[in-house]
């Protein structure tokens, strides 16, 4: 006489969870700008632009990078004096108000692969030029020799460009804020902080 095998309810629950988890892995996740009356949004590249104290700061999500939450940052100095900041001081705030520091350079290869080279969205330079023709994104920024290797200094009417990588929070959080703090004026020591507000869309 044949015995009927019974499937226990807990195994059914586990199976359903695994199926749902597998489906979520194939969801498209995009980081997009949140409307801010104090900011300019570039719709094609999803970039956010803030202007304060003669400094223009831009943040653009790199949605083609899947292993981490990645952002391109551009700082343009329109003042007549030098400004400086430290990239390592930048951080991200998630929906739960948890602070996440950038991934250390020594771990970039682990997360991104040996041959990874970050690129800004191709629409971004065109949109920036249309918005402000005095800011040109062509050509690499000119680095300055410094005693402090952690500090980035920007000459008047020049820009700095860099990339920030964070352990992936866009899976669990619906909102992200990128903070670029303490851009210091070498003229009067004024410090300027920029906050970029993004939302996470899944589909």
Regions found by a protein language model. Name each.
Residues 13-22:
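Bacterial N-terminal signal peptides
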Residues 58, 70-74, 84, 91:
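Soluble periplasmic/extracytoplasmic beta-strand elements of cell-envelope proteins
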Residues 65-72, 160:
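Short, solvent-exposed loop/turn segments enriched in Ser/Thr/Gly
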Residues 75-79:
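Asparagine-centered strand-capping/turn motif at beta-strand->loop junctions
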Residues 88-134, 144:
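Structured domain cores in non-transmembrane regions
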Residues 2-12:
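Bacterial N-terminal signal peptides that target proteins for export
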Residues 24-47, 91-93, 125-203:
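Surface-exposed edge beta-strand/loop patches
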Residues 81-89, 103, 176-177:
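Short, hydrophobic/aromatic beta-strand segments
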């Amino acid at each position: 006489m044949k015995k009927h095998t019974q499937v226990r309810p807990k195994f059914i629950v586990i199976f359903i969870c695994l199926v749902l988890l597998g489906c979520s892995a194939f969801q498209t996740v995009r980081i997009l700008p949140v409307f801010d009356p104090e900011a300019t949004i570039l719709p094609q590249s999803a970039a956010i632009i803030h202007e304060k104290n003669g400094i223009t700061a831009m943040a653009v999500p790199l949605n083609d990078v899947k292993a981490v939450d990645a952002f391109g940052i551009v700082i343009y100095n329109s003042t007549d004096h030098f400004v400086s900041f430290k990239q390592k001081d930048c951080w991200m705030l998630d929906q739960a108000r948890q602070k996440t520091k950038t991934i250390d350079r020594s771990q970039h290869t682990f997360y991104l692969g040996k041959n990874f080279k970050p690129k800004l969205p191709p629409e971004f330079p065109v949109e920036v030029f249309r918005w402000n023709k005095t800011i040109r994104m062509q050509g690499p920024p000119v680095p300055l020799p410094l005693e402090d290797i952690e500090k980035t200094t920007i000459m008047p009417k020049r820009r700095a460009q860099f990339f920030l990588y964070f352990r992936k929070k866009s899976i669990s959080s619906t909102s992200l804020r990128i903070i670029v703090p303490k851009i210091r004026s070498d003229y009067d020591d004024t410090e300027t902080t920029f906050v970029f507000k993004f939302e996470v869309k899944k589909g």
